[in-house]
Amino acid sequence: MLQERLNMLMDDITLQGKKLAKHMDVRDMKRYRELIKQFMNEIVSRSHKFSRENFLDRRGRHRVYGMIKLVDATLDELATELLKDEKDHLIILGKIDEIRGLLLDIFT
């Protein structure tokens, strides 16, 4: 059940990321951020269902929280780029890909 929910959210995030890359609209960014927040909330609230080694770094700390901070920081960078008058499409695409990669890293 959790796996299905995460797969659905990941698909929605991917589609919304494509929409955001195409239109570069603040409303699309807001929806994108909401979907990512839902995904991360599912991961954090139900992380006990995953094996513990998926969430521990080399020092035994929970890796997922560091990854979430990184996703948040990258989302902020993406939002900043979207709000610029001179939007750099390549930077926006790169940030969307980076976020997707981080989410997949958390997910797998």
Question: Across the structure, where does each feature detected by a protein language model lie?
Answer:
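N-terminal intrinsically disordered, cationic/polar leader segments
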Residues: 1-40, 47-62, 74, 90
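Alpha-helix boundary/capping detector
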Residues: 39-46, 62, 66, 97, ...
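Short, well-ordered alpha-helical segments
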Residues: 67-75
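C-terminal or internal capping secondary-structure element at the end of a domain, subdomain, or sheet
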Residues: 74-108
